[in-house]
Amino acid sequence: MTGETMLCRRVRLVRGNHDAHAGDPPREWRVTCVDEPYAMPPFLACHHATRPPSGYALCGHVHPGIRVATAGESARLPCFVLGRERAILPAFGRFTGLADIAPMRDERIVAVAGLALFELPAMSQNCNA
């Protein structure tokens, strides 16, 4: 068995707000559904953006986005919000939308543009635009 095959053998889905209505995936998909926080030391997989008392939270509910602008052009891009206690992960796809975010002082913004990632300078982080 290759490393790639092994990686695909265990899928964990942290239940979120839409799952109460949609329900768990069919059993034949072999997806294990878990409630938050799901411990994967040193990480906690969380649906909601939280700051845990211990561990590092990987959060997904917010679908953070940022507006970046140049002279005459602007774009809204998905972004990562990275801090000392948590990372808020972007959603990829048009169905989810993007939420304007306001990072905490200890958090950095890394925007996603196609296949490129770029960290925004702290002084240009205007996430409520």
What is the predicted role of each segment?
Residues 1-129:
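Extended recognition/assembly regions associated with phosphoester-bond processing machinery
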